[in-house]
Amino acid sequence: MIDKESLKKCLKLYLVTDSEMLKGRDFYKCLEDAISSGITTVQLREKNASGREFLRKAMKLREITKRYGVKFIINDRVDIALICDADGVHVGQSDIDVREVRKLIGNNKILGVSARTLEEAICAKNDGADYLGVGSIFTTSTKLDAKSASFETVKEIKEKVDMPFVLIGGINLDNIDKLKCLESDGYAIISAILKAEDISKEVEKWTLKI
């Protein structure tokens, strides 16, 4: 079983990958720069990658994250998570059934689920999720069709669903202070870190801010 308190610490600064944000820069170097500077969990999420490319990136990132003692989560692809022995899987509401994922990965791997409403959060917990990705909190360029989750909804989820959660969606250093009142366990970041010219310095700024 996954220890809830240990998991909360791992969720503090959660980086979701998107190689298109890097504009041609070396994917592995950028990710290692981020990981070595304070990222606590990495989720491999490459929606436009072929299966072969996704697997290649997963195997290499598994090596890097292990070296730094950082948790490694695979988005959607349970098969690849098992092949590369990732720490866990994250699925959305329209992806594979959460209960089926839990059966496939067992009880010793982390299972994260996206949730926008209290109902989705409750279902995710009942179906075997270990943590929630709650959002989109703000408008985001990485998921244009993402519907927002209100602050009131987040507060309800925290109060009524006793499980770790990260906030996701359009979060940056200029608006993060607005989120402190929501008392999440961490923040899932994409563009605010990956678009930075100096990723190491950007991650260091985040570690000081949160």
Curated annotation (Swiss-Prot):
GO terms for cellular component: cytoplasm. GO terms for molecular function: magnesium ion binding; thiamine-phosphate diphosphorylase activity. Keywords: Magnesium, Metal-binding, Thiamine biosynthesis, Transferase. Its cofactor is Mg(2+). CDD domains: TMP_TenI (cd00564). 2-[(2R,5Z)-2-carboxy-4-methylthiazol-5(2H)-ylidene]ethyl phosphate binds at residues 140-142, 170, 190-191. Mg(2+) binds at residues 76, 95. Its EC number is 2.5.1.3. 4-amino-2-methyl-5-(diphosphooxymethyl)pyrimidine binds at residues 43-47, 75, 114, 143. InterPro entries: Aldolase_TIM, ThiamineP_synth_sf, ThiamineP_synth_TenI, TMP_synthase. GO terms for biological process: thiamine biosynthetic process; thiamine diphosphate biosynthetic process. Pathway: Cofactor biosynthesis; thiamine diphosphate biosynthesis; thiamine phosphate from 4-amino-2-methyl-5-diphosphomethylpyrimidine and 4-methyl-5-(2-phosphoethyl)-thiazole: step 1/1. It catalyses: 2-[(2R,5Z)-2-carboxy-4-methylthiazol-5(2H)-ylidene]ethyl phosphate + 4-amino-2-methyl-5-(diphosphooxymethyl)pyrimidine + 2 H(+) = thiamine phosphate + CO2 + diphosphate; 2-(2-carboxy-4-methylthiazol-5-yl)ethyl phosphate + 4-amino-2-methyl-5-(diphosphooxymethyl)pyrimidine + 2 H(+) = thiamine phosphate + CO2 + diphosphate; 4-methyl-5-(2-phosphooxyethyl)-thiazole + 4-amino-2-methyl-5-(diphosphooxymethyl)pyrimidine + H(+) = thiamine phosphate + diphosphate. Binds 1 Mg(2+) ion per subunit. Belongs to the thiamine-phosphate synthase family. Condenses 4-methyl-5-(beta-hydroxyethyl)thiazole monophosphate (THZ-P) and 2-methyl-4-amino-5-hydroxymethyl pyrimidine pyrophosphate (HMP-PP) to form thiamine monophosphate (TMP). This is Thiamine-phosphate synthase. It comes from Clostridioides difficile (strain 630). The lineage of its organism: Bacteria, Bacillati, Bacillota, Clostridia, Peptostreptococcales. The gene is thiE.
